[in-house]
Regions:
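Core RecA-like ATPase module of SF1/SF2 helicases and allied nucleic-acid translocases
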Residues: 1-168
């Protein structure tokens, strides 16, 4: 556990390259910590109800990488580590936050993403329907995340099993 995202990123990169011999930013088996609450991917009737900041997800399968809206995304099949009875699910990850020195997208980046997604629905005449389409767009709702091997102290709102996190 470290005090800053910058330091966590340096340690994570070193662990991935020198111990796990992984060169890519994302690999099957990676455990990622969610950095922003997400209400889109799980139904309200699911065990957790939503994906919370601090939850850990494990990547079971990487379906594809997508570059869209000048950002990088990964479509993956994931499992929530803290909820073993919760079925695994398909989701989209926002890779911009994976190595970011900030916890999540900044205000300007978030606004830029919103505007670019809105362009996809510019042919919708009704402002309300356009707003609903934007808010239900899978890329707009991509999960912000950081690598869960090393984490900083202010990102954690719950206790993490470090044996699982470090050893995968």
């Amino acid at each position: 556990i470290v005090r800053s995202n910058k330091r966590a990123n340096l340690y994570n990169k070193s662990i991935r390259e020198r111990i796990l011999f992984l060169e890519s930013d994302l690999a099957v088996g990676d455990q990622l910590m969610v950095v922003k609450n997400n209400y889109f991917w799980l139904g309200a009737d699911s065990q957790p109800g939503f994906i919370a900041n601090g939850d850990v997800i494990r990547i079971n399968r990487i379906n594809k990488y997508v570059e869209r809206y000048d950002m990088k995304f990964a479509e993956v099949h994931a499992k929530m580590v803290d909820y073993p009875n919760q079925p695994s699910f398909d989701t989209v990850l926002l890779l911009e936050t994976l190595n970011s020195e900030t916890a999540n997208l900044g205000f300007e980046q978030s606004q830029l993403l919103y505007r670019k997604v809105a362009q996809d629905y510019s042919n919708e005449k009704s402002k309300y329907k356009r707003f609903i389409k934007i808010k239900t767009d899978p890329y707009f709702n991509a999960i912000g995340n950081s690598l869960g091997t090393i984490t900083n102290t202010y990102d954690n709102t719950n206790i993490i099993n470090l044996d699982v996190m470090v050893l995968y």
